[in-house]
């Protein structure tokens, strides 16, 4: 009888999880399809938004197409990339809805903090990159190609597809860099790695920065050097912030232990929660 009860509970939990996965997958697919068609419908406006840093240069600036299918490929690529950025919050929310019901109250608070931190870093880095980094990069590249004499005339007329891909790569590098401090803080908070492990193994972090820069950046040595430097700098800043947070938490924990609040809290710990989702 006990075996039948355990088998029934297992089948019920498995059916519940599979049903929840099906619901979340349907929502993601619907959002993905609607977002892609919407981005393709407004693909010209999206391309203009990405091309705005180049179009604001002081001289006559315009793009060229050298192939018959280049314009269509640019529209499709821009729509797909913009769709991936716009649908990312929906995918994150559906994953959050799937995982959060099985957590305790303290775990929910902790995971919500990581979720908000990840989203804030993502949009902050994206905004700073598009509003400050990309215009300065194109301003530098434009005036590097300018000539100071009349004996040699060089006029920059970039291909629209190459320009969009390079701009998207810069934005993607910033998106990857934005999640580095979140990952470091998450590992330290969940005790997956200690702060001493990070500080004593900085050479491995440098290898990680080189590997990430080589994997996610275009095959250009200067782009990889800049990406490696940015990732290393962000990791060091995250370790510094985590060190400050750890010192504050140790002081708070010692104060709570002296007052006896931690022992009282451990005695009144809540019972385990069952997996049940009411999020839609």
From Swiss-Prot:
Any Pfam family matching the protein: TatC
InterPro entries per UniProt: TatC
Membrane disposition: Multi-pass membrane protein
GO BP term, example: protein transport by the Tat complex
A single GO cellular-component term on record: TAT protein transport complex
Annotated stretches, region: Disordered: 258-280
Spans traversing the lipid bilayer: 46-66, 81-101, 114-134, 137-157, 170-190, 225-245
GO molecular function: proton motive force dependent protein transmembrane transporter activity
Keywords: Membrane, Mitochondrion, Transmembrane, Transmembrane helix
Subcellular location: Mitochondrion membrane
Family: Belongs to the TatC family.
Extra remark: A stretch of 270 kb of the mitochondrial genome is duplicated within the centromere of chromosome 2 resulting in the duplication of the gene. The expression of the duplicated gene (At2g07716) is not demonstrated. It is also probably not RNA edited and therefore differs in all the positions known to be edited.
Protein name in the entry: Uncharacterized tatC-like protein ymf16
Source organism of this protein record: Arabidopsis thaliana
């Amino acid at each position: 009888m006990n075996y039948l009860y355990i088998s029934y509970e297992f089948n019920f939990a498995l059916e519940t999880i599979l049903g929840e996965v099906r619901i979340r997958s349907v929502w993601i697919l619907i959002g993905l399809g609607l977002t892609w068609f919407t981005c393709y419908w407004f693909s010209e406006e999206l391309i203009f938004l990405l091309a705005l840093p180049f179009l604001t240069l002081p001289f006559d600036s315009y793009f060229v197409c050298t192939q018959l299918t280049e314009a269509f490929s640019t529209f499709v690529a821009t729509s797909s990339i913009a769709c991936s950025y716009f649908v990312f919050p929906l995918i994150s929310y559906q994953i959050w809805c799937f995982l959060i019901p099985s957590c305790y109250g303290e775990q929910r608070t902790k995971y919500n903090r990581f979720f908000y931190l990840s989203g804030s870093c993502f949009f902050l880095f994206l905004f700073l990159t598009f509003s400050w980094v990309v215009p300065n990069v194109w301003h530098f590249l434009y005036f590097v190609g300018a000539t100071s004499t009349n004996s040699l005339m060089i006029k920059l007329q970039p291909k629209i597809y190459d320009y969009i891909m390079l701009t998207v790569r810069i934005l993607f590098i910033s998106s990857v860099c934005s999640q580095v401090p979140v990952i470091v803080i998450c590992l330290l908070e969940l005790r997956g790695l200690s702060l001493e492990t990070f500080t004593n193994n900085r050479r491995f972090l440098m290898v990680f920065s080189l590997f990430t820069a080589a994997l996610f950046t275009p095959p250009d040595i200067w782009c990889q050097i800049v990406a490696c430097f940015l990732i290393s700098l962000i990791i060091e800043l995250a370790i510094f912030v985590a060190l400050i947070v750890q010192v504050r938490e140790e002081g708070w924990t010692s104060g709570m232990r002296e007052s006896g609040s931690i022992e009282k809290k451990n005695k009144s710990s809540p019972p385990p929660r069952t997996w049940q989702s009411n999020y839609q």
